[in-house]
Amino acid sequence: IQRTGELLGIEVIKLANALHASGDNTSFKMRTDSLQFSTRADKNRKVNVHIATFLINDFAIAVCPGEMFVQLQLEWKAKARLADVTPLFFGYTYVKGRSPGYVADVRSAALGGFGAEGGNRIQVGGGEAIINKHLESLYILNDQRASIHLK
């Protein structure tokens, strides 16, 4: 483990030395949203899921509580790249409210299995709605990228 840490440290230093600023200005934009879903067990109960989307230069960051299934994360990354950005996704993050727990994509919810059945607090399809809201926010931020510049 010691050797693995040393090798990882060497690679981190190489990467850090290879990074260069993209210009004199740094842009930073963010949007927060709250989406309301029915719970999976009781359609009359509601859960608010709070998310945030950031655009820092050409890095797009989606922040969401709970554990989004990997298919949803891959969808975010593929569609975010269409906006000519480097997408990052962070789950288990707290913006506000309560965690939705496991968030399965529709296909995984239909197939069942670990995390796709009883662990889902929000309705089936909620994961896709969260990803779509992140993408909507990203595209809005990307169109406004030049509106805030920090030196």
Locate each region found by the language model.
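Non-catalytic substrate/cofactor recognition surfaces at enzyme active-site rims
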Residues: 1-151
